[in-house]
Amino acid sequence: MNLKDLYIDYFKGLGHVQISSAPIVPVNDNSVLFNTAGMQPLVPYLLGKVHPDGVRLCDYQKCVRLTDLDEIGDTTHHTFFEMLGNWSLGDYFKEESISYSFNFLTKVLGIPVERLAVTVFRGNDSIPRDDVSYNKWLSLSIPKERIALTFEDNFWIAGDTGPCGPDTEIFYFRSDDEIPSSYDLNDDRWVEIWNNVFMEYEKHADGTFTDLPKKNVDTGMG
């Protein structure tokens, strides 16, 4: 069974409904040339519209990222790829999402815990540190030495405006070298494999944030 099937079957087992990949060229969205993430076709539902397939969704979305053209030739970026994703539209939130991701990686794929590290939103003057995610990772045996607190890389928004929120990124140690006891943001042997975004806010053109009507989860893997 390939990775896509394992992923979809796992999340179906957790009550998610598989939705189809949207067209690469967005429909009714002129903000981008191509769909760049699995959440992009779901923006209306992340802003509060009711999705016809329910509150737990999963898929693999075809994506094109022109911003990654400068990265062609490295070992971690693709211009075209299929992003695996799962969403909660006002249903589960941070703790459940992190548990689902952790269990898929360690129990379904069999990745050793010591090969995983994470980053968590450290907070700023407007939005507090994400202590819920930090403490959840600790409870799952990720030691504090492999939990990095950052700002810019751990607050996610698709563009200048729209649904957004803190995120927690998961990294895999891909080298055959001895696994370090701590995570170094500048060590490229650690590669990001999954991002869990906790969409709590909508950013407006004037730079202000308002609470979304529902707290949503948007994850992207790949």
Segments the model singles out, each with a brief description of its role:
Residues 1-221:
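Alpha-helical segments
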